[in-house]
Amino acid sequence: SSAASDVYKRQHYQDPFKPLIGGIKFADFNDLESVKAQITDKTCAIIMETVQGEGGIYPATKEFLQGVRDLCDEYDILLILDEIQCGMGRTGKLFAWQDYGVQPDVMTCAKALGCGVPVGAFVLNKKTAEHSLVPGDHGTTYGGNPLACAAVNAVFDCYEKQHIVEHVAQTAPYLEQKLDELVEKYDCLAARRGKGFMQGLVVTGRPVGEVINRAIENGLLVISAGSDVLRMVPPLVITKDDIDEMIEKLEKALQ
């Protein structure tokens, strides 16, 4: 938990748990030179989200993520991708990194992995597992819990039978189109960012909290990401009719 707080650059969450572990450096997202400048002979891993969530819905560019992968290979550094929010089909791929032509050494996954059952996974590729961990190195009281693992199996069965990932890939362009139309129509919207069913609208000229409250009053649940982004992470089974209803309610909040 302390290490997780260390790599999450929010004073609000870090202050109650200081002193932290330390040894963490931060680079600018989608700026490869910024990442390279932080690398030393003591760098062991680069940790990042494939699509930033709390930071404001920023997808990594292909050039950036591929460049980070190349740096990790060049300097023998682990690439750890956080797919807790952007994974499990949300971007139209089972895992967001699959759209980038790279593969992480380590991946974290949770949230939708259990569809309500609390479970997380720390996934290593074969090379990393063979050279870093042996049984007993990382003990856990609840690791491999039968109930949680049964839930994960059921989730994957559901994904396969209902073609969840394919549905997201087919339906997301419609959502993106409708959101782009809102950006064109309303001056208070500066841009749309995101991938698949993980979308954000940049709100300008008015508090994003005001838009959120008005949306809730109209029966639409949305949340912020960063200080000025309206975040939308709808259910993966949402239909075009649902999207139309969502856009209608969102327009009422923007007017």
Predicted regions span which residues?
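Conserved N-terminal phosphate-binding loop of PLP-dependent enzymes in the Aspartate aminotransferase
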Residues: 2-255
